[in-house]
A protein has these predicted regions:
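N-terminal Rossmann-like NAD(P) cofactor-binding module of classical short-chain dehydrogenase/reductase
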Residues: 93-94
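Short amphipathic alpha-helix with an adjacent loop that forms part of the alpha/beta core around
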Residues: 81-88
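N-terminal Rossmann-like dinucleotide-binding module
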Residues: 12-70, 149-152
Length: 174
């Protein structure tokens, strides 16, 4: 129940409040991004109303576009160093790294009490999944696994077109 309520609060804040009314600088989340290029770029670009305070990527060249977009964010190559230096300044973390690093980065973030958005796959085995589930409950944080097919703007846009009658009668979808 707690997670449903907390997730609902975060959803309302992310979707309704900022998009309709703007977000006060005093009410912005301080977000750290781990994995800045590629899929990471698509993820951090979805939270323009929040405050990106740290960015971490082992591939500095690939991350350069994101780094330049947030000149005030502190830059790191190692997420462990980022957490050591900045954990008190971070509210939530976006993790868009290669699959094999999801568990380690997520667990450190949870242990520090940070809310976490993790790209799919969430984990490599059932033990990691159960450990993450227990950690989210224990540390009372909100977590979400991203699945780009369901979290990108395109799907929402098509739904709006359908609801507005722009598409007409839909007979078949592939």
């Amino acid at each position: 129940q707690h997670h449903s309520s907390a997730a609902s609060d975060v959803y309302k804040r992310q979707v309704f409040i900022p998009s309709l009314f703007g977000n006060s600088p005093n009410n912005r989340l301080n977000i750290a991004v781990i994995g800045v290029g590629g899929r990471g770029r698509a993820n951090w670009s979805q939270v323009p109303q929040e405050n990106i305070v740290a960015m971490c990527d082992v591939d500095q060249k690939r991350a350069s576009r994101g780094f330049s977009k947030f000149p005030n964010a502190k830059k790191f190559k190692d997420f462990r160093v980022m957490f050591d230096k900045m954990s008190n300044e971070i509210d939530a973390v976006i993790i868009s790294t290669p699959d094999h690093t999801h568990f380690a980065a997520t667990m450190i973030a949870m242990e520090l009490g940070k809310h976490v958005y993790v790209e799919k796959p969430l984990a490599h085995n059932v033990w990691e999944l159960r450990t993450m589930k227990k950690a989210a409950k224990y540390y009372k944080i909100v977590s979400q696994m991203g699945n780009q097919g369901h979290t990108t703007e395109g799907l929402r846009l098509i739904k709006e077109w359908y609801d507005a009658g722009v598409l007409g009668d839909v007979k078949e979808v592939h």
